[in-house]
C-alpha cells in the first residue's frame, strides 16, 4: 500500500514538473500546414525565451489579443525590421526572405494589398502562418505585433498522433 502511495506521489511530481517546463497544445486549424497538420500535438518549451530571443523561423504558441485565444504561428519579422509583401513574396528590410527550409517555392504571400509594409517595433515580433492563403495572422490583426510576454512556448516537438497507423 505504501509503494502505491509513493507511485501516486511520483506521478503527480512528474506531471507538475512537466507542466512547469513544457506546454502541450493541439493544432486547431490548417493555418500552419504543411508544417503542422490539423490535430497534430505540440510540445513547447515554456522557458525558451527567458535567456534567448525568438529567432526568425521559430514556431511559437502565443496569446493573441484580437482573437482572445492561444495561436501557433511562425516568427517572421524581428524587432526593428520592415516586413513587406511584393509579388506574393515576403521581404525583410527590402530583401526577399528565403523560406525554403519550411515552405514550398510555390507558396505566395500577400495582404490583399500589394506593397504593404509593416515596421516591427522594438520588443515585438511579426508572426505568419505557413498556409498563407488561409492563415489569420499579423497581416490582418488589429494588434499586429506579438511580444515575448505574449509568447507561451517555443515548439520543440510535433507529435502527429492522428497520422500514425497505430492510433
For every predicted segment, state its role.
Residues 3, 29-31, 135:
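Short linear Ser/Thr-Pro motifs
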Residues 16-32:
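Aromatic-capped interface at the extracytoplasmic side
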Residues 1-13:
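Single conserved hydrophobic/aromatic residue that forms the stacking wall/gate
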Amino acid at each position: 500500500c505504501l509503494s502505491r502511495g509513493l507511485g501516486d506521489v511520483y506521478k503527480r511530481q512528474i506531471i507538475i514538473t512537466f507542466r512547469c517546463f513544457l506546454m502541450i497544445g493541439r493544432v486547431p486549424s490548417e493555418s500552419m500546414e504543411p508544417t503542422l497538420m490539423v490535430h497534430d500535438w505540440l510540445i513547447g518549451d515554456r522557458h525558451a525565451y527567458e535567456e534567448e530571443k525568438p529567432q526568425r523561423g521559430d514556431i511559437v504558441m502565443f496569446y493573441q489579443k484580437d482573437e482572445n485565444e492561444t495561436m501557433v504561428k511562425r516568427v517572421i519579422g524581428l524587432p526593428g525590421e520592415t516586413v513587406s509583401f511584393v509579388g506574393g513574396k515576403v521581404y525583410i528590410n527590402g530583401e526577399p526572405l528565403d523560406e525554403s527550409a519550411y515552405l514550398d517555392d510555390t507558396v505566395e504571400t500577400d495582404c490583399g494589398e500589394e506593397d504593404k509594409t509593416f515596421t516591427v517595433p522594438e520588443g515585438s515580433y511579426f508572426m505568419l502562418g505557413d498556409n498563407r492563403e488561409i492563415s489569420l495572422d499579423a497581416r490582418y490583426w488589429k494588434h499586429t505585433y506579438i511580444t515575448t510576454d505574449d509568447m507561451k512556448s517555443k515548439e520543440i516537438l510535433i507529435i502527429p498522433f492522428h497520422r500514425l497507423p497505430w492510433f
